[in-house]
Amino acid sequence: MPIKIPNKNRSAVVFPKNRKVLEQLGDNIKLAFKRRGYTQVLISERTGLSRLTIRKIEQGDPKVSIGHYVAVLSVLGLTEGFAGVANDDELGHKLQDIKLMNKQKRISQ
């Protein structure tokens, strides 16, 4: 059986709705730069990322590593908000509660 080697040039499929989310994130980051008076050159120097990568982040490019987005958010002082993205998982809590309630019913029967 042949061993499959992952294709490093393959990128994730990004649906239009999710693409819009990334574009909005890029717009928000770009606006945060402007509000602070930061340039792409300054962000590039502080993160060690190329200006091309910074520009791609501003555009919400899905091919840019999430780590690069976090590096830029860190320079902007915005990582705390990013860390809380999936913190309040209301649907997950409801599903967990249903599962726990079903377990409890089986135990008491």
Model feature map: region roles:
Residues 1-14:
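N-terminal intrinsically disordered/low-complexity leader segments
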Residues 11-35:
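A short, Lys/Arg-rich alpha-helix, primarily the initiator
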Residues 27-42, 103-109:
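Short basic helix-loop element that most often maps to the first helix and adjoining turn
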Residues 37-55:
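Short alpha-helical DNA-recognition segment
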Residues 61-74:
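Short, basic-rich loop-to-helix N-cap that marks the start of a DNA-contacting helix
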Residues 83-109:
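Short, charged recognition helix plus adjacent turn
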